[in-house]
Curated annotation (Swiss-Prot):
Residues 210-220, 536-550, 717-728 have a biased composition (Low complexity). Monomer. Binds to RNA. This is RNA-binding protein VTS1. GO terms for molecular function: mRNA binding; nucleotide binding. It comes from Mycosarcoma maydis (Corn smut fungus). Residues 586-596 have a biased composition (Gly residues).
Length: 728
């Protein structure tokens, strides 16, 4: 409680000292009013006041003590206008006769006692078992309610609360709100709490504004001021200086960082006019890039009554253009390009990749960097060279357009006649390919090996319009095909691999789909031909009488021969034919993976064992004839080996090659296991005789285009070689 009373104002300057009360310390207590201590109220007479003043002057050497300043500061006792007590040291509400401070403090203590008693009663009630059960039932009922029902129930219960309960609820709700950092930050009241201070300090360190500071209620300190919005709130040096006035380094650092981000920004949204108004809610101007006009910045003051709203500022004439067109590089860095091509409306290229003839104007916004201009010029030059303004896949692709006309053989006239893609005038072809192959002037054989044909590629024989743009091959690329032994003793010959790698370096920029498909087929056929030649070379090393494949020259890459490589057709396992005579070991090399091919050395093929013969589907699968499995589901292998050509045809084997393969296999099985057919004079009578072999070979050659092509190319050599094989 207060120990000083309410003082009256002096009546006149002459009796100023009379109307002041002194401290009762060291003197007898003076009580004028039983309800107020040291009060000069109605019960005090003028005579008593005079005695009090005289007693104070005699006891303290004419110095009066003021209770407002602690009773220790001496004041001059002489009367005069200059010796009056200043009004700032006098307590307010001088004309009241009561003591509001003491009464308020008394009520406060009484309320505290009431609150303590209430809390004790609440604690005692919480320990009551009956009350606990009832409260748990109420809580269970409250949990099943919806949010609206809970709010309505709480509101109805609060209507019946007393003033003490209301104050208690207010205090509890405030404590609950302060425990939540979001509520503490957004709440307009109690914005000076510890959590709010920490959040505001964090925002100030980041250079952002505090929403709680903008929502703070009006107080005597800031009633006449208005929180002004900074036009560049994000990373603004002004905001940093406002939160830390003494730290100028942070402001300069933020200013430099903001300038750097603005210079390198490519896709951030800009600001429109009227976006930086002062909002009472969330601050939408915290990511603004452009400030207002200079006139608007000068007119902004701390007073809210004299500030001009930004919406009335028409000094910026940027309404009709992009909000971020403020520099010479904005068009290059802008996500929206000035061209009409949708492909250039991306962030990756800094220059348009496609030619735009309609684009004109070289204003300040179209100024390019030197490097960008150089890149654009190089792209345009490449498009003109490539043709029709198409985008090059790789601008660093080397172009080889040199011609090599040296060391061209004079005997190989077949390589220089006709529309041959690999003729001696084509750029980039090794000169060694023109060496005479030993086959005379026949141009079909060489053309079948390397000619792709104008019908497939749509080109002509002009060397300058070569469709493939083949880079120069190594001089040793085809040398392996010209050695006496063929150079293919090792299947993984490095020279052959070099040749295939050189053929893989073709320029495919100007090829359409059909040309690319034909090129892939040609490369596949060449690979098959090379593998076949490698197998034939291995067989020739075992046969002294084998034909030297070195005479083939470059014609070894013929697609006609490639048709025999790796084929597992039934025809490859028939009796000696024109093809087998023409190419010794070809049947053995082609049928190495099958069961029907015969060895060129005269050896028999491997006959399946009894376990395989018992499983007819597996046996047919081994013979590559599994398509006829349903035809022999009910047949035994012993019945099958006794069948003839007519019986197989009745079983549904309509293909002549399949029947011949079956008959040959059946004959081998009968020979191995000693089974004889009725009327069989000699082993193998189930197979057609020599005349039938010749007729069948002629039919087979008529069915196969590849065999006919080989017959024409060999030119009778195959017929001459077939006679000793037939005698065998």
């Amino acid at each position: 409680m207060s120990d000083f009373g309410l003082l009256r104002s002096p009546l006149t300057p002459s009796n100023a000292s009379i109307n002041r009360a002194s401290s009762p310390s060291g003197h007898r207590p003076i009580t004028m009013n039983p309800h107020s201590r040291y009060s000069l109220g109605k019960g005090a007479s003028t005579e008593h006041m005079m005695r009090l003043a005289q007693h104070g002057n005699a006891g303290h050497d004419g110095a009066l003590r003021s209770p407002s300043i602690g009773g220790n500061a001496p004041m001059p006792g002489s009367a005069g206008p200059r010796n009056l007590r200043p009004s700032s040291e006098m307590l307010p509400n001088m004309n009241h006769h009561g003591t509001p401070e003491s009464e308020a403090i008394d009520r406060w203590f009484e309320d505290l006692q009431h609150y303590e008693a209430t809390l004790e009663e609440m604690a005692a009630a919480s320990l009551d078992q009956n009350f606990k059960e009832e409260l748990s039932a109420i809580e269970q009922w409250f949990r099943v309610l919806s949010e609206a029902e809970r709010t309505a129930a709480l509101y109805s219960l609060l209507q019946e609360s007393t003033q003490v309960q209301i104050r208690f609820f207010i205090t509890v709700l405030q404590q609950m709100a302060r425990s939540d950092p979001v509520s503490a930050l957004l709440s307009p009241s109690h914005h000076n709490s510890t959590m709010a201070d920490q959040m505001e300090a964090k925002l100030a360190s980041l250079g952002l504004k505090s929403p709680s500071a903008l929502k703070s209620p009006a107080s005597p300190g800031n009633r006449g001021y208005r929180q002004s919005s900074d036009a560049a709130g994000f990373l603004s040096p002004n905001v940093a200086a406002m939160y830390s006035p003494g730290n100028t380094d942070a402001a300069s650092t933020l200013a430099a960082q903001r300038a750097k981000l603005k210079a390198n920004r490519t896709s951030a949204p800009g600001t429109l006019i009227g976006e930086s108004r002062n909002y009472s809610g969330g601050q939408l101007d915290q990511v603004q890039e452009r400030g207002g006009s200079p006139n608007l910045q000068q007119q902004r003051t701390l007073s809210g009554d004299h500030s001009r709203p930004k919406s009335t500022d028409f000094s910026n004439n940027n309404v009709g253009r992009s909000p971020r067109a403020s520099g010479p590089l904005d068009d290059q860095l802008s996500p929206i390009s000035a061209t009409g091509n949708w492909s250039s409306m991306v962030n990756t290229p800094l220059v348009p990749m496609f030619t735009d003839n309609d684009k004109a104007g070289t204003g300040e916004a179209n100024v390019n960097l030197d490097t960008a201009a150089a890149q654009l010029a190089s792209l345009q030059q490449q498009q003109q060279v490539g043709g029709n303004g198409r985008v090059m896949v790789d601008p660093d692709v080397p172009r080889f357009r040199r011609k090599s006309n040296q060391n061209i053989g004079g005997g190989g006239s077949s390589y220089g006649q006709g529309p041959n893609l690999y003729d001696h005038t084509s750029p980039g072809v090794s000169p060694n390919i023109g060496v005479p192959s030993g086959w005379g002037q026949s141009d079909n054989f060489g053309r079948g090996g390397l000619n792709t044909g104008l019908s497939a590629f749509g080109g002509n024989n002009d060397s300058n319009s070569n469709q493939f743009n083949i880079p120069p091959m190594s001089p040793n690329a085809l040398a392996g095909l010209q050695s006496p032994s063929g150079g293919l003793a090792n299947p993984l010959n490095m020279q052959v691999m070099n040749m295939m790698a050189a053929m893989g370096g073709l320029n495919l920029n100007n090829m359409n789909g059909a040309q690319l498909l034909a090129m892939q087929q040609q490369l596949l056929q060449n690979q098959q031909a090379l593998s076949m030649l490698a197998q034939q070379q291995q067989l020739q090393q075992q046969q002294p009488h084998g034909r030297n494949l070195g005479n083939f020259g470059g014609g070894g890459l013929s697609p006609g021969l490639a048709g025999q490589a790796g084929r597992k057709s039934p025809r490859s396992g028939t009796s000696p034919s024109v093809r087998a005579a023409a190419l010794p070991g070809a049947a053995g090399g082609a049928g190495s993976g099958g069961a029907g091919a015969s060895n060129a050395a005269g050896g028999e093929e491997e006959v399946a064992d009894l376990s395989t013969l018992e499983d007819v589907p597996a046996w047919l699968r081994q013979l590559r004839l599994h398509k006829y499995t349903p035809n022999f589901e009910t047949s035994h292998w012993k019945e099958m080996v006794m069948m003839g050509d007519k019986q197989l045809e009745d079983k549904g084997v309509a293909a002549l090659g399949a029947r011949r393969k079956m008959l040959k296999t059946f004959e081998l099985v009968r020979k191995k296991y000693g089974i004889r057919m009725d009327g069989e004079d000699r082993p193998g009578s189930g197979v057609p005789d020599g005349n039938n072999d010749k007729a069948a070979d002629v039919d087979d050659a008529g069915d196969s285009n590849e065999a006919q092509e080989v017959d024409r190319e060999l030119g009778g050599a195959a017929t001459a070689a077939s006679a000793p094989v037939a005698k065998d």
